[in-house]
Amino acid sequence: MRKNGFVVMGHLLKLVTPLAHIMAFTITMGTLGFLAAIFIMVLGATGLVNLLNFDTHLSFSGILTALIVLAVARGALRYLEQMSGHYIAFKLLALLRDKVFSSLRRLAFVKLQDKQAGQLVSLVTNDIELLEVFYAHTIAPIMIAFFTSAILLLVFAQLSSWFVLVALAAYLTVGVILPIITTKLAREDGRRYRELVGEMNDFFLDSVRGMKEIQLFGYAKQRLDEIQQRSQKIDTAFERIKDQEAKVRVYTEVAVSVFNIIMLFTGLILFSLDKIDFAAFLIGVILLMSSYGPVIALSNLSSNLLQTLASGERVLSLLAEEPELKDVESAVDLKDVSRIDVENVNFAYGEEQILSDVSLSVKKGEILGIHGRSGSGKSTLLKLLMRFYDPKSGSIKINGETLPNINTCSLRDNMAYITQQTYIFNETIEENIRLARRDATLEEIMEAAKKASIHDFILSLPQGYQTKMTELGGNLSDGEKQRIGIARAFLHNAPIILLDEPTSNLDSLNEAMILKSLLNVKAEKLIILVSHRQSTMAICDQVIGIENGRMS
Protein backbone atom coordinates (compact mmCIF):
# COMPACT_ATOMS: atom_id res chain seq x y z
CA MET A 1 0.00 0.00 0.00
CA ARG A 2 1.39 3.40 -1.02
CA LYS A 3 2.08 5.87 1.77
CA ASN A 4 1.35 9.58 1.57
CA GLY A 5 4.50 11.71 1.30
CA PHE A 6 3.76 13.49 4.57
CA VAL A 7 3.27 10.13 6.31
CA VAL A 8 6.68 8.96 5.04
CA MET A 9 8.30 12.20 6.22
CA GLY A 10 6.60 11.84 9.61
CA HIS A 11 8.01 8.34 10.13
CA LEU A 12 11.48 9.45 9.03
CA LEU A 13 11.32 12.42 11.42
CA LYS A 14 10.68 10.11 14.39
CA LEU A 15 14.17 8.70 13.94
CA VAL A 16 15.66 12.16 14.59
CA THR A 17 14.31 12.29 18.17
CA PRO A 18 17.55 11.09 19.88
CA LEU A 19 19.47 13.82 18.02
CA ALA A 20 16.89 16.58 18.44
CA HIS A 21 19.32 18.82 20.37
CA ILE A 22 21.84 18.68 17.52
CA MET A 23 19.09 19.36 15.01
CA ALA A 24 18.07 22.43 17.04
CA PHE A 25 21.69 23.62 16.90
CA THR A 26 21.76 23.09 13.11
CA ILE A 27 18.54 25.06 12.64
CA THR A 28 19.81 27.90 14.84
CA MET A 29 23.11 28.15 12.98
CA GLY A 30 21.36 28.01 9.62
CA THR A 31 18.84 30.69 10.56
CA LEU A 32 21.53 33.03 11.88
CA GLY A 33 23.68 32.33 8.82
CA PHE A 34 20.92 33.28 6.37
CA LEU A 35 20.06 36.38 8.40
CA ALA A 36 23.73 37.39 8.31
CA ALA A 37 23.81 37.00 4.52
CA ILE A 38 20.55 38.93 4.09
CA PHE A 39 21.56 41.80 6.34
CA ILE A 40 24.87 42.16 4.50
CA MET A 41 22.74 43.25 1.55
CA VAL A 42 20.49 45.39 3.76
CA LEU A 43 23.45 47.15 5.36
CA GLY A 44 24.93 47.66 1.92
CA ALA A 45 21.68 49.33 0.89
CA THR A 46 21.78 51.40 4.08
CA GLY A 47 25.30 52.54 3.21
CA LEU A 48 24.05 53.52 -0.26
CA VAL A 49 21.26 55.55 1.34
CA ASN A 50 23.88 57.29 3.50
CA LEU A 51 25.91 58.16 0.40
CA LEU A 52 22.77 59.72 -1.07
CA ASN A 53 22.61 61.95 2.03
CA PHE A 54 19.51 60.32 3.53
CA ASP A 55 19.60 59.97 7.32
CA THR A 56 19.71 56.34 8.51
CA HIS A 57 21.10 57.06 12.02
CA LEU A 58 24.12 54.86 11.16
CA SER A 59 27.66 56.04 10.46
CA PHE A 60 29.50 54.82 7.38
CA SER A 61 32.30 53.35 9.54
CA GLY A 62 29.73 51.56 11.70
CA ILE A 63 28.11 50.05 8.61
CA LEU A 64 31.50 48.94 7.25
CA THR A 65 32.41 47.29 10.58
CA ALA A 66 29.05 45.52 10.71
CA LEU A 67 29.49 44.27 7.14
CA ILE A 68 32.88 42.74 7.98
CA VAL A 69 31.52 41.10 11.16
CA LEU A 70 28.50 39.70 9.31
CA ALA A 71 30.65 38.36 6.46
CA VAL A 72 32.93 36.48 8.88
CA ALA A 73 29.94 35.29 10.93
CA ARG A 74 28.20 34.06 7.77
CA GLY A 75 31.11 31.76 6.94
CA ALA A 76 31.41 30.38 10.48
CA LEU A 77 27.66 29.87 10.86
CA ARG A 78 27.40 28.13 7.49
CA TYR A 79 30.23 25.78 8.43
CA LEU A 80 28.63 24.89 11.77
CA GLU A 81 25.25 24.33 10.11
CA GLN A 82 26.68 21.99 7.47
CA MET A 83 28.89 20.12 9.92
CA SER A 84 26.12 19.43 12.45
CA GLY A 85 23.54 18.70 9.73
CA HIS A 86 25.71 16.09 8.06
CA TYR A 87 26.69 14.62 11.44
CA ILE A 88 22.98 13.97 12.05
CA ALA A 89 22.48 12.60 8.53
CA PHE A 90 25.33 10.09 8.60
CA LYS A 91 24.58 9.08 12.19
CA LEU A 92 21.01 8.29 11.17
CA LEU A 93 22.11 6.47 8.01
CA ALA A 94 24.26 4.19 10.17
CA LEU A 95 21.27 3.67 12.49
CA LEU A 96 19.01 2.88 9.52
CA ARG A 97 21.45 0.35 8.09
CA ASP A 98 21.55 -1.36 11.47
CA LYS A 99 17.74 -1.34 11.65
CA VAL A 100 17.42 -2.70 8.10
CA PHE A 101 19.88 -5.52 8.78
CA SER A 102 18.05 -6.34 12.03
CA SER A 103 14.80 -6.35 10.07
CA LEU A 104 16.27 -8.73 7.49
CA ARG A 105 17.33 -11.06 10.31
CA ARG A 106 13.85 -10.81 11.81
CA LEU A 107 12.17 -11.61 8.49
CA ALA A 108 14.47 -14.52 7.67
CA PHE A 109 13.92 -17.26 6.69
CA VAL A 110 10.35 -17.23 5.38
CA LYS A 111 9.67 -13.65 4.29
CA LEU A 112 13.00 -13.22 2.49
CA GLN A 113 12.27 -16.14 0.16
CA ASP A 114 9.91 -13.89 -1.81
CA LYS A 115 12.31 -10.94 -2.06
CA GLN A 116 14.77 -10.41 -4.90
CA ALA A 117 18.43 -10.07 -3.89
CA GLY A 118 19.00 -7.14 -6.26
CA GLN A 119 16.08 -5.22 -4.79
CA LEU A 120 17.46 -5.74 -1.28
CA VAL A 121 20.97 -4.68 -2.36
CA SER A 122 19.50 -1.53 -3.93
CA LEU A 123 17.56 -0.79 -0.74
CA VAL A 124 20.48 -1.31 1.65
CA THR A 125 22.88 0.78 -0.46
CA ASN A 126 21.19 3.30 -2.77
CA ASP A 127 17.89 3.86 -0.98
CA ILE A 128 19.42 4.42 2.45
CA GLU A 129 22.13 6.64 0.95
CA LEU A 130 19.47 8.81 -0.69
CA LEU A 131 17.92 9.49 2.72
CA GLU A 132 20.97 11.68 3.40
CA VAL A 133 19.15 14.27 1.28
CA PHE A 134 16.23 14.22 3.69
CA TYR A 135 18.21 14.36 6.92
CA ALA A 136 20.95 16.78 5.83
CA HIS A 137 19.14 18.90 3.24
CA THR A 138 15.42 18.80 4.04
CA ILE A 139 14.53 18.96 7.74
CA ALA A 140 16.85 21.82 8.67
CA PRO A 141 16.15 23.90 5.51
CA ILE A 142 12.39 23.71 6.16
CA MET A 143 12.77 24.96 9.73
CA ILE A 144 15.42 27.51 8.73
CA ALA A 145 13.09 28.88 6.05
CA PHE A 146 10.25 29.12 8.56
CA PHE A 147 12.21 30.95 11.27
CA THR A 148 14.09 33.18 8.82
CA SER A 149 10.87 34.19 7.07
CA ALA A 150 9.13 34.86 10.39
CA ILE A 151 11.95 37.14 11.55
CA LEU A 152 12.05 38.96 8.22
CA LEU A 153 8.29 39.53 8.29
CA LEU A 154 8.78 41.26 11.65
CA VAL A 155 11.41 43.48 10.00
CA PHE A 156 9.05 44.24 7.09
CA ALA A 157 6.37 45.14 9.64
CA GLN A 158 8.63 47.96 10.88
CA LEU A 159 8.66 49.38 7.33
CA SER A 160 5.10 48.86 6.07
CA SER A 161 2.21 46.43 6.51
CA TRP A 162 1.95 46.29 2.70
CA PHE A 163 5.52 45.01 2.56
CA VAL A 164 4.51 42.26 4.99
CA LEU A 165 1.67 41.12 2.71
CA VAL A 166 3.86 41.05 -0.41
CA ALA A 167 6.70 39.23 1.38
CA LEU A 168 4.31 36.71 2.97
CA ALA A 169 2.73 35.95 -0.42
CA ALA A 170 6.20 35.57 -1.98
CA TYR A 171 7.48 33.21 0.73
CA LEU A 172 4.33 31.06 0.68
CA THR A 173 4.33 30.82 -3.12
CA VAL A 174 8.01 29.99 -3.56
CA GLY A 175 8.53 27.94 -0.40
CA VAL A 176 5.21 26.13 0.04
CA ILE A 177 2.78 26.23 -2.89
CA LEU A 178 5.24 25.51 -5.72
CA PRO A 179 7.01 22.61 -3.90
CA ILE A 180 3.69 20.95 -3.01
CA ILE A 181 2.32 21.23 -6.55
CA THR A 182 5.48 19.98 -8.27
CA THR A 183 5.97 17.14 -5.78
CA LYS A 184 2.43 15.89 -6.30
CA LEU A 185 2.78 16.05 -10.07
CA ALA A 186 6.06 14.14 -10.22
CA ARG A 187 6.17 11.91 -7.15
CA GLU A 188 5.31 8.82 -9.20
CA ASP A 189 8.36 9.50 -11.40
CA GLY A 190 10.68 9.28 -8.40
CA ARG A 191 9.06 6.08 -7.15
CA ARG A 192 9.19 4.49 -10.61
CA TYR A 193 12.87 5.40 -11.00
CA ARG A 194 13.82 3.74 -7.69
CA GLU A 195 11.83 0.62 -8.64
CA LEU A 196 13.55 0.41 -12.04
CA VAL A 197 17.00 0.75 -10.43
CA GLY A 198 16.17 -2.06 -7.99
CA GLU A 199 14.92 -4.29 -10.82
CA MET A 200 18.06 -3.55 -12.84
CA ASN A 201 20.30 -4.48 -9.91
CA ASP A 202 18.43 -7.75 -9.52
CA PHE A 203 18.58 -8.52 -13.26
CA PHE A 204 22.29 -7.72 -13.47
CA LEU A 205 23.09 -9.80 -10.37
CA ASP A 206 21.11 -12.68 -11.87
CA SER A 207 23.03 -12.33 -15.15
CA VAL A 208 26.43 -12.40 -13.42
CA ARG A 209 25.52 -15.48 -11.37
CA GLY A 210 24.18 -17.27 -14.45
CA MET A 211 27.02 -16.23 -16.77
CA LYS A 212 28.11 -19.82 -17.44
CA GLU A 213 24.61 -20.93 -18.47
CA ILE A 214 24.13 -17.77 -20.57
CA GLN A 215 27.32 -18.53 -22.51
CA LEU A 216 26.60 -22.26 -22.82
CA PHE A 217 23.16 -21.75 -24.35
CA GLY A 218 24.10 -18.79 -26.56
CA TYR A 219 21.86 -16.36 -24.70
CA ALA A 220 24.45 -13.59 -24.27
CA LYS A 221 23.20 -11.29 -27.04
CA GLN A 222 19.57 -11.48 -25.89
CA ARG A 223 20.61 -10.86 -22.31
CA LEU A 224 22.72 -7.86 -23.33
CA ASP A 225 19.83 -6.49 -25.39
CA GLU A 226 17.54 -6.77 -22.38
CA ILE A 227 20.08 -4.96 -20.18
CA GLN A 228 20.17 -2.16 -22.75
CA GLN A 229 16.37 -2.00 -22.83
CA ARG A 230 16.21 -1.81 -19.05
CA SER A 231 18.93 0.86 -19.05
CA GLN A 232 16.89 2.87 -21.54
CA LYS A 233 13.86 2.70 -19.25
CA ILE A 234 16.00 3.96 -16.35
CA ASP A 235 17.38 6.78 -18.52
CA THR A 236 13.86 7.76 -19.56
CA ALA A 237 12.67 7.82 -15.95
CA PHE A 238 15.73 9.86 -14.93
CA GLU A 239 15.15 12.32 -17.77
CA ARG A 240 11.58 12.82 -16.56
CA ILE A 241 12.91 13.66 -13.09
CA LYS A 242 15.48 16.09 -14.51
CA ASP A 243 12.81 17.65 -16.70
CA GLN A 244 10.73 18.14 -13.57
CA GLU A 245 13.70 19.74 -11.80
CA ALA A 246 14.15 22.17 -14.69
CA LYS A 247 10.47 23.11 -14.59
CA VAL A 248 10.70 23.73 -10.84
CA ARG A 249 13.64 26.10 -11.37
CA VAL A 250 11.75 27.96 -14.11
CA TYR A 251 8.59 28.30 -12.00
CA THR A 252 10.68 29.49 -9.06
CA GLU A 253 12.59 32.10 -11.06
CA VAL A 254 9.35 33.41 -12.59
CA ALA A 255 7.68 33.64 -9.17
CA VAL A 256 10.69 35.44 -7.67
CA SER A 257 10.78 37.94 -10.54
CA VAL A 258 7.03 38.59 -10.31
CA PHE A 259 7.13 39.26 -6.57
CA ASN A 260 10.22 41.45 -6.91
CA ILE A 261 8.33 43.58 -9.43
CA ILE A 262 5.26 43.66 -7.18
CA MET A 263 7.41 44.76 -4.22
CA LEU A 264 9.11 47.42 -6.35
CA PHE A 265 5.81 48.91 -7.51
CA THR A 266 4.34 48.62 -4.00
CA GLY A 267 7.31 50.54 -2.63
CA LEU A 268 7.09 53.20 -5.34
CA ILE A 269 3.37 53.71 -4.69
CA LEU A 270 3.89 53.96 -0.93
CA PHE A 271 6.83 56.34 -1.43
CA SER A 272 4.82 58.53 -3.83
CA LEU A 273 2.01 58.67 -1.27
CA ASP A 274 4.51 59.61 1.48
CA LYS A 275 3.62 56.45 3.40
CA ILE A 276 7.32 55.54 3.65
CA ASP A 277 10.56 57.42 3.16
CA PHE A 278 13.17 56.61 0.53
CA ALA A 279 15.32 54.64 3.00
CA ALA A 280 12.40 52.34 3.90
CA PHE A 281 11.56 51.92 0.21
CA LEU A 282 15.10 50.94 -0.79
CA ILE A 283 15.69 48.72 2.25
CA GLY A 284 12.33 46.95 1.80
CA VAL A 285 12.93 46.15 -1.87
CA ILE A 286 16.51 44.96 -1.33
CA LEU A 287 15.49 43.00 1.78
CA LEU A 288 12.95 40.97 -0.22
CA MET A 289 15.29 40.47 -3.19
CA SER A 290 18.04 39.15 -0.93
CA SER A 291 15.83 37.01 1.31
CA TYR A 292 14.70 34.28 -1.09
CA GLY A 293 17.61 31.95 -0.23
CA PRO A 294 15.84 29.87 2.44
CA VAL A 295 12.55 29.51 0.52
CA ILE A 296 14.27 28.81 -2.83
CA ALA A 297 16.09 26.00 -0.99
CA LEU A 298 12.64 24.60 -0.17
CA SER A 299 11.54 24.93 -3.78
CA ASN A 300 14.62 23.05 -4.97
CA LEU A 301 13.95 20.33 -2.41
CA SER A 302 10.86 19.12 -4.22
CA SER A 303 12.80 17.52 -7.08
CA ASN A 304 15.25 15.78 -4.74
CA LEU A 305 12.41 14.66 -2.51
CA LEU A 306 10.82 12.77 -5.40
CA GLN A 307 13.51 10.10 -5.15
CA THR A 308 14.11 10.50 -1.42
CA LEU A 309 10.50 9.86 -0.43
CA ALA A 310 10.34 6.86 -2.77
CA SER A 311 13.48 5.47 -1.12
CA GLY A 312 12.13 6.30 2.34
CA GLU A 313 8.90 4.46 1.56
CA ARG A 314 10.80 1.34 0.48
CA VAL A 315 12.99 1.40 3.61
CA LEU A 316 10.06 2.04 5.97
CA SER A 317 8.01 -0.73 4.33
CA LEU A 318 10.79 -3.21 5.04
CA LEU A 319 11.19 -2.00 8.64
CA ALA A 320 7.42 -2.28 9.22
CA GLU A 321 7.05 -5.73 7.68
CA GLU A 322 6.11 -8.40 10.19
CA PRO A 323 7.81 -11.83 10.20
CA GLU A 324 5.82 -14.98 9.52
CA LEU A 325 6.30 -15.87 13.19
CA LYS A 326 7.57 -13.63 15.97
CA ASP A 327 10.45 -14.90 18.07
CA VAL A 328 9.47 -16.26 21.47
CA GLU A 329 11.59 -14.72 24.24
CA SER A 330 9.87 -15.24 27.60
CA ALA A 331 9.26 -18.97 27.61
CA VAL A 332 11.01 -22.29 28.29
CA ASP A 333 14.69 -22.93 27.50
CA LEU A 334 15.49 -26.37 26.13
CA LYS A 335 17.71 -28.57 28.29
CA ASP A 336 18.77 -32.18 27.82
CA VAL A 337 16.72 -32.90 24.71
CA SER A 338 15.29 -36.40 24.98
CA ARG A 339 12.52 -36.68 22.37
CA ILE A 340 10.52 -35.02 19.61
CA ASP A 341 6.85 -35.78 19.00
CA VAL A 342 4.92 -34.69 15.92
CA GLU A 343 1.19 -35.16 16.49
CA ASN A 344 -1.42 -35.01 13.71
CA VAL A 345 0.27 -32.10 11.92
CA ASN A 346 -1.42 -30.43 8.96
CA PHE A 347 0.21 -27.65 6.97
CA ALA A 348 -0.53 -25.71 3.78
CA TYR A 349 1.17 -22.97 1.76
CA GLY A 350 -1.84 -20.77 1.10
CA GLU A 351 -4.44 -23.05 -0.47
CA GLU A 352 -1.96 -25.81 -1.34
CA GLN A 353 -2.04 -28.63 1.21
CA ILE A 354 1.50 -29.88 1.90
CA LEU A 355 1.24 -32.13 4.97
CA SER A 356 -1.83 -34.03 6.14
CA ASP A 357 -2.17 -35.72 9.53
CA VAL A 358 1.55 -36.45 9.98
CA SER A 359 2.61 -38.06 13.27
CA LEU A 360 5.98 -39.40 14.38
CA SER A 361 8.22 -39.78 17.43
CA VAL A 362 11.98 -39.95 17.74
CA LYS A 363 14.16 -40.22 20.84
CA LYS A 364 17.70 -39.25 21.74
CA GLY A 365 20.12 -41.87 20.44
CA GLU A 366 17.95 -42.63 17.41
CA ILE A 367 18.16 -41.74 13.74
CA LEU A 368 14.80 -41.20 12.08
CA GLY A 369 14.77 -41.42 8.30
CA ILE A 370 12.15 -39.65 6.20
CA HIS A 371 11.88 -41.00 2.69
CA GLY A 372 9.86 -39.77 -0.25
CA ARG A 373 9.87 -38.25 -3.68
CA SER A 374 10.76 -34.62 -4.37
CA GLY A 375 7.92 -32.26 -3.43
CA SER A 376 6.25 -34.73 -1.07
CA GLY A 377 6.66 -32.45 1.98
CA LYS A 378 9.82 -33.86 3.59
CA SER A 379 11.73 -30.55 3.67
CA THR A 380 8.63 -28.70 4.86
CA LEU A 381 8.47 -30.96 7.90
CA LEU A 382 12.03 -29.98 8.84
CA LYS A 383 11.11 -26.29 8.49
CA LEU A 384 8.20 -26.88 10.86
CA LEU A 385 10.60 -28.50 13.34
CA MET A 386 12.82 -25.39 13.11
CA ARG A 387 9.64 -23.32 13.60
CA PHE A 388 10.06 -21.30 10.44
CA TYR A 389 6.31 -21.92 10.20
CA ASP A 390 3.62 -23.14 12.59
CA PRO A 391 1.37 -26.04 11.55
CA LYS A 392 -2.23 -25.19 10.67
CA SER A 393 -3.33 -27.87 13.13
CA GLY A 394 -1.70 -30.49 15.29
CA SER A 395 1.41 -29.93 17.40
CA ILE A 396 5.16 -30.45 17.51
CA LYS A 397 6.69 -31.07 20.94
CA ILE A 398 10.24 -31.29 22.24
CA ASN A 399 10.54 -32.83 25.71
CA GLY A 400 6.75 -32.48 25.95
CA GLU A 401 6.76 -28.71 25.28
CA THR A 402 5.09 -27.36 22.15
CA LEU A 403 7.38 -25.22 19.98
CA PRO A 404 5.51 -21.91 20.65
CA ASN A 405 6.28 -22.44 24.36
CA ILE A 406 10.03 -22.70 23.76
CA ASN A 407 12.32 -19.66 23.46
CA THR A 408 13.23 -19.29 19.80
CA CYS A 409 16.95 -18.70 20.48
CA SER A 410 17.08 -21.79 22.68
CA LEU A 411 15.26 -23.84 20.03
CA ARG A 412 17.69 -22.82 17.27
CA ASP A 413 20.74 -23.25 19.54
CA ASN A 414 19.70 -26.85 20.13
CA MET A 415 19.36 -27.63 16.42
CA ALA A 416 21.81 -28.02 13.56
CA TYR A 417 19.97 -27.75 10.25
CA ILE A 418 21.68 -28.84 7.04
CA THR A 419 19.84 -27.71 3.91
CA GLN A 420 20.23 -29.01 0.37
CA GLN A 421 22.14 -25.86 -0.65
CA THR A 422 25.06 -24.67 1.48
CA TYR A 423 25.87 -20.97 1.25
CA ILE A 424 29.58 -20.21 1.13
CA PHE A 425 30.70 -16.75 2.25
CA ASN A 426 33.53 -14.79 0.66
CA GLU A 427 35.85 -15.72 3.54
CA THR A 428 38.44 -18.39 4.28
CA ILE A 429 37.37 -22.01 4.67
CA GLU A 430 38.20 -21.74 8.37
CA GLU A 431 35.84 -18.77 8.82
CA ASN A 432 33.14 -20.45 6.75
CA ILE A 433 33.10 -23.43 9.10
CA ARG A 434 33.53 -21.26 12.22
CA LEU A 435 30.21 -19.62 11.34
CA ALA A 436 28.56 -22.44 13.32
CA ARG A 437 30.39 -21.47 16.53
CA ARG A 438 32.31 -18.22 16.67
CA ASP A 439 34.51 -19.22 19.64
CA ALA A 440 35.68 -22.49 18.06
CA THR A 441 39.42 -23.19 17.91
CA LEU A 442 41.18 -24.29 14.73
CA GLU A 443 41.58 -27.77 16.23
CA GLU A 444 37.81 -28.04 16.78
CA ILE A 445 37.18 -26.83 13.23
CA MET A 446 39.59 -29.44 11.86
CA GLU A 447 37.91 -32.18 13.89
CA ALA A 448 34.50 -31.18 12.49
CA ALA A 449 35.98 -31.17 8.98
CA LYS A 450 37.33 -34.69 9.50
CA LYS A 451 33.88 -35.92 10.52
CA ALA A 452 32.46 -34.29 7.38
CA SER A 453 35.12 -35.97 5.19
CA ILE A 454 36.43 -32.62 3.93
CA HIS A 455 39.65 -32.27 5.99
CA ASP A 456 41.97 -34.00 3.50
CA PHE A 457 40.60 -31.94 0.62
CA ILE A 458 41.17 -28.70 2.55
CA LEU A 459 44.77 -29.66 3.34
CA SER A 460 45.37 -30.32 -0.36
CA LEU A 461 44.67 -26.65 -1.13
CA PRO A 462 47.69 -24.27 -1.29
CA GLN A 463 46.59 -22.24 1.74
CA GLY A 464 44.73 -25.04 3.51
CA TYR A 465 42.15 -23.71 5.94
CA GLN A 466 43.18 -20.15 5.03
CA THR A 467 42.10 -20.61 1.41
CA LYS A 468 39.86 -17.72 0.44
CA MET A 469 36.52 -18.64 -1.10
CA THR A 470 35.27 -16.82 -4.19
CA GLU A 471 31.73 -15.43 -4.40
CA LEU A 472 29.11 -18.11 -3.61
CA GLY A 473 31.93 -20.66 -3.27
CA GLY A 474 32.58 -20.69 -7.00
CA ASN A 475 35.91 -22.49 -6.49
CA LEU A 476 34.19 -25.48 -4.83
CA SER A 477 32.08 -28.28 -6.26
CA ASP A 478 28.53 -28.83 -4.99
CA GLY A 479 29.72 -31.86 -3.02
CA GLU A 480 32.52 -29.88 -1.36
CA LYS A 481 30.08 -27.12 -0.40
CA GLN A 482 27.75 -29.72 1.07
CA ARG A 483 30.52 -31.23 3.18
CA ILE A 484 31.44 -27.78 4.53
CA GLY A 485 27.79 -27.42 5.53
CA ILE A 486 27.95 -30.77 7.31
CA ALA A 487 31.19 -29.70 9.03
CA ARG A 488 29.31 -26.67 10.34
CA ALA A 489 26.66 -28.96 11.81
CA PHE A 490 29.27 -31.10 13.56
CA LEU A 491 31.00 -27.98 14.91
CA HIS A 492 27.71 -26.53 16.17
CA ASN A 493 27.42 -29.70 18.29
CA ALA A 494 23.68 -29.29 18.83
CA PRO A 495 21.72 -32.17 20.43
CA ILE A 496 19.28 -32.21 17.48
CA ILE A 497 20.57 -32.65 13.93
CA LEU A 498 18.23 -32.12 10.99
CA LEU A 499 19.66 -33.13 7.62
CA ASP A 500 17.88 -32.38 4.34
CA GLU A 501 19.40 -34.54 1.58
CA PRO A 502 22.91 -34.32 3.13
CA THR A 503 24.44 -36.80 0.68
CA SER A 504 22.66 -35.80 -2.54
CA ASN A 505 25.84 -34.32 -4.07
CA LEU A 506 28.29 -36.91 -2.67
CA ASP A 507 29.77 -40.01 -4.24
CA SER A 508 29.29 -43.36 -2.51
CA LEU A 509 32.68 -43.22 -0.74
CA ASN A 510 32.11 -39.79 0.83
CA GLU A 511 28.51 -40.73 1.61
CA ALA A 512 29.70 -43.76 3.55
CA MET A 513 32.17 -41.62 5.53
CA ILE A 514 29.48 -39.04 6.42
CA LEU A 515 27.03 -41.74 7.48
CA LYS A 516 29.74 -43.37 9.60
CA SER A 517 30.32 -40.01 11.35
CA LEU A 518 26.59 -39.74 12.06
CA LEU A 519 26.61 -43.22 13.57
CA ASN A 520 29.59 -42.27 15.75
CA VAL A 521 27.72 -39.31 17.32
CA LYS A 522 24.31 -41.00 17.32
CA ALA A 523 24.31 -41.93 21.02
CA GLU A 524 24.39 -38.28 22.14
CA LYS A 525 22.15 -36.86 19.41
CA LEU A 526 18.63 -36.95 18.09
CA ILE A 527 18.95 -37.14 14.31
CA ILE A 528 16.29 -36.71 11.63
CA LEU A 529 17.54 -37.52 8.16
CA VAL A 530 15.64 -36.65 4.98
CA SER A 531 16.76 -38.39 1.80
CA HIS A 532 15.50 -40.11 -1.32
CA ARG A 533 18.53 -42.45 -1.34
CA GLN A 534 17.91 -45.97 -0.03
CA SER A 535 21.61 -46.26 0.87
CA THR A 536 21.30 -43.27 3.21
CA MET A 537 18.20 -44.72 4.88
CA ALA A 538 20.17 -47.87 5.77
CA ILE A 539 21.67 -46.30 8.93
CA CYS A 540 18.28 -45.20 10.33
CA ASP A 541 16.62 -46.87 13.32
CA GLN A 542 13.21 -46.18 11.84
CA VAL A 543 12.10 -44.94 8.43
CA ILE A 544 8.82 -43.29 7.52
CA GLY A 545 7.68 -42.52 4.02
CA ILE A 546 5.82 -39.37 2.97
CA GLU A 547 3.78 -39.43 -0.22
CA ASN A 548 1.82 -36.35 -1.31
CA GLY A 549 2.01 -34.97 2.23
CA ARG A 550 0.75 -38.14 3.91
CA MET A 551 2.61 -40.86 5.78
CA SER A 552 2.90 -44.04 3.77
Swiss-Prot record:
Residues 23-307 form the ABC transmembrane type-1 domain. Residues 340-552 form the ABC transporter domain. One of its GO terms (biological process) is cell redox homeostasis. Coiled coil: none annotated. InterPro entries: AAA+_ATPase (IPR003593), ABC1_TM_dom (IPR011527), ABC1_TM_sf (IPR036640), ABC_CydC/D (IPR014223), ABC_transporter-like_ATP-bd (IPR003439), P-loop_NTPase (IPR027417), Type_1_exporter (IPR039421). GO terms for cellular component: plasma membrane. ATP binds at G372, R373, S374, G375, S376, G377, K378, S379. PROSITE patterns: ABC_TM1F, ABC_TRANSPORTER_2. The chain crosses the membrane at residues 22-42, 52-72, 139-159, 162-182, 253-273, 278-298. Disulfide bonds: none annotated. It is found in: Cell inner membrane. Its main location: membrane. It comes from the Bacteria. Gene3D superfamilies: ABC transporter type 1, transmembrane domain (1.20.1560.10), P-loop containing nucleotide triphosphate hydrolases (3.40.50.300). Keywords: ATP-binding, Cell inner membrane, Cell membrane, Membrane, Nucleotide-binding, Transmembrane, Transmembrane helix, Transport. Pfam families: ABC_membrane (PF00664), ABC_tran (PF00005). It is a multi-pass membrane protein. One of its GO terms (molecular function) is ABC-type transporter activity. NCBIfam families: CydC. Belongs to the ABC transporter superfamily. Lipid exporter (TC 3.A.1.106) family. This is Probable ABC transporter ATP-binding/permease protein HI_0664. It comes from Haemophilus influenzae (strain ATCC 51907 / DSM 11121 / KW20 / Rd).
